[in-house]
Amino acid sequence: MKLRVQLEMVAACCLLAASSLAVGQGAAAKTASPADAVNAQLSLIEGEMMGAVKAMPAEKYSFAPSASVFVPSQKTVYPTGIRTFAQQATHVAQANYFFFSSVSGMKPDADVQAIAKLSNKDEIVAALAASFAFGHKAIATLTTANAFEVLKSNEPGLQTRATLSTFAVAHGFDHYGQMVEYLRMNGIVPPASAQ
């Protein structure tokens, strides 16, 4: 009986593999370039993050979580130096310029150091949007020929254009998750959750 069940499982796996191969052969004709693949992901985080920065009221841009927002019995210990909402957004903008200039070799089209000093909501929203636009231009330089060329990088594991560009997208999602919590702590439903 055990042998029969094992044979049925093997047969089922073979059928699944064969059907996957058949579907895969049809899809093989439709391949995306590295630029298209990464650009789609950058567009996703751009849409979500831009919605978040626009949703936060200007007077809440200085908000940062602290132990005071938690129930005292939780005994939450917060280190000093937690980024404000504004600092989260400016950090992502600066990081976009850093990562994507490394990916493409293009010089940033903004004063990256000055971004950290921004405190006005409209200026921060504009700087973040510009950093995403720069990212799209940089990603457009990715090709099948250069995506896995080794770059000079001090970051282990981020030595190719492909890994660095996908890390930039992941970095954005990390900070977007934190910004969503900031919105919720202020009673604001993130636009991506409201859809």
Where are these regions (language model features)?
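Solvent-exposed, charged/polar functional surfaces in cytosolic regulatory/catalytic domains
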Residues: 48-51, 55, 134-141, 178
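Acidic/histidine-rich alpha-helical segments that form the ligand environment
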Residues: 116-152, 161-175
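Short, contiguous alpha-helical
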Residues: 39, 43-50, 62-113, 152-195
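Terminal, regulation- and interaction-focused segments at domain boundaries
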Residues: 29-37
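Bacterial N-terminal signal peptides
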Residues: 8-22
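Boundary at the C-terminal end of the N-terminal hydrophobic targeting segment
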Residues: 22-29
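N-terminal secretory signal peptides that target proteins for export/translocation
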Residues: 1-6
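Surface-exposed helix-capping loop/turn segments at secondary-structure junctions
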Residues: 54-63, 139-148, 184-190
